[in-house]
């Protein structure tokens, strides 16, 4: 009986500690992504593999933390939820950016900066796609 109560208390504490993903969290993650992109670009200009790798890893870490806007996740109306594909689109963009970040690391390390720069450009396109379609720029 004590074990059950202990597990319930711990489970409740863990649930409460994982607060909802807020707009402030998203802004912080977006700023970290911007810094990571700057770091990758600086690494390209100075032909510095360490900067490129660190920036790509930082970008990958930040993109994994981002989540869809809370108001879309908590949508109560089933029809609006069905018609709204922003959650699916943002998850798809996250996956693509993460893949391209890995490509940047691999290509630049292997001595193919042209392909690494192309992956960087594709990440920028995905960022703009998200900001135009989801964030309504």
Please give the residue ranges for each predicted region.
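The canonical Cys-X-X-Cys-His
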Residues: 123-135
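Generic detector of bulky aromatic hydrophobic side chains
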Residues: 19-20, 137
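Extracytoplasmic c-type cytochrome modules immediately beyond a signal peptide or single-pass transmembrane anchor
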Residues: 20-122
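Positively charged n-region of N-terminal signal peptides that target proteins for export
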Residues: 1-4
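Bacterial N-terminal signal peptides
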Residues: 6-15
């Amino acid at each position: 009986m004590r074990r059950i109560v202990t597990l319930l208390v711990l489970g409740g504490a863990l649930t409460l500690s994982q607060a909802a993903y807020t707009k402030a969290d998203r802004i912080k993650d977006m700023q970290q992504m911007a810094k990571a992109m700057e770091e990758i670009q600086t690494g390209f200009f100075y032909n510095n593999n360490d900067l490129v790798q660190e920036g790509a890893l930082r970008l990958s870490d930040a993109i994994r933390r981002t989540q869809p806007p809370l108001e879309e996740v908590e949508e109560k109306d089933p029809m609006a939820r069905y018609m709204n594909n922003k959650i699916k689109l943002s998850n798809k963009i996250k996956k693509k950016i993460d893949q391209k970040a890995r490509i940047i690391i691999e290509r630049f390390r292997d001595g193919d900066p042209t392909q690494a720069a192309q992956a960087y450009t594709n990440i920028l396109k995905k960022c703009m796609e998200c900001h135009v379609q989801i964030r309504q720029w």
